[in-house]
């Protein structure tokens, strides 16, 4: 993928809160293209920053290449909880979903004190949100009987408490939904070759796709967060490979941001 030069950001409408950081979540199915897309956005504008999914934490990768991926005791001493979840979901789904959400909250909170503090028109793109953690992935695992009733009740209670403590800082100004068919996502899973994902069946992706569509396209999925019903959503069709043909998608993002 060609590296686009960084340049000045588009002119946005002045916010009544001055330089308050606009927070946008990039949502979509597994392998829809979120990582590729946020990396494109990060390179386009000095006032744009991204918070990638902390996959390294989940896979126990000993890497300090990313500012959001510094090692923790749980990462140094733990196993590959992503792989454990895929291999034995009935045993590890609750553990994985709890840790995935915890590591996401930690990374996203840390980013708020980063370089965007001094930006003129700061925009922070999250690769997924605490809401998809619960209402897409954890919910699907519960409905698939990979979490029992007690685990699901504890998870929801824990998620509510964590959001009561930290959620206001992470409330979204907008959502960008990268829409791709389950078949496209399955093909991209194969192409990117992440070992933990190679056994994912099409049926699993179809269930996640249905939940994404209900939440972000039809807006029929109910949550405990009333404000989400009013959050603007931009849907982008990413069934075609966009790594080297992203200009039209970026223009839609700029137009979307100008309305927030």
Swiss-Prot record:
Modified residues (Phosphoserine): 11, 15, 74
Effect the entry attributes to changing residue 133 to A: Strongly increased catalytic efficiency towards deoxycytidine. Strongly increased catalytic efficiency towards deoxythymidine
Gene3D superfamilies assigned: P-loop containing nucleotide triphosphate hydrolases
Broad EC category: transferase
Substitution effect: residue 104 to L: Strongly increased catalytic efficiency towards deoxythymidine
Main location: nucleus
Keyword rRNA-binding: no
Annotated active site: 127
Posttranslational modification: Phosphorylated and activated in vitro upon phosphorylation at Ser-74 by CSNK1D/CK1.
Modified residues (Phosphothreonine): 72
Any one biological process term the GO annotation gives: dAMP salvage
GO molecular-function terms, A-Z: ATP binding; cytidine kinase activity; deoxyadenosine kinase activity; deoxycytidine kinase activity; deoxyguanosine kinase activity; protein homodimerization activity
UniProt keywords, alphabetically: ATP-binding, Kinase, Nucleotide-binding, Nucleus, Phosphoprotein, Transferase
Binding site for substrate: 53, 86, 97, 128, 133, 197
Entry EC number(s): 2.7.1.74, 2.7.1.76, 2.7.1.113
CC annotations in GO: cytoplasm; cytosol; mitochondrion; nucleoplasm
Pfam family, one: dNK
Compartments where located: Nucleus
Reactions this protein catalyses: 2'-deoxycytidine + a ribonucleoside 5'-triphosphate = dCMP + a ribonucleoside 5'-diphosphate + H(+); 2'-deoxyadenosine + ATP = dAMP + ADP + H(+); 2'-deoxyguanosine + ATP = dGMP + ADP + H(+)
Function: Phosphorylates the deoxyribonucleosides deoxycytidine, deoxyguanosine and deoxyadenosine. Has broad substrate specificity, and does not display selectivity based on the chirality of the substrate. It is also an essential enzyme for the phosphorylation of numerous nucleoside analogs widely employed as antiviral and chemotherapeutic agents.
Subunit note: Homodimer.
Family: Belongs to the DCK/DGK family.
Protein name, entry field: Deoxycytidine kinase
Gene coding for it: DCK
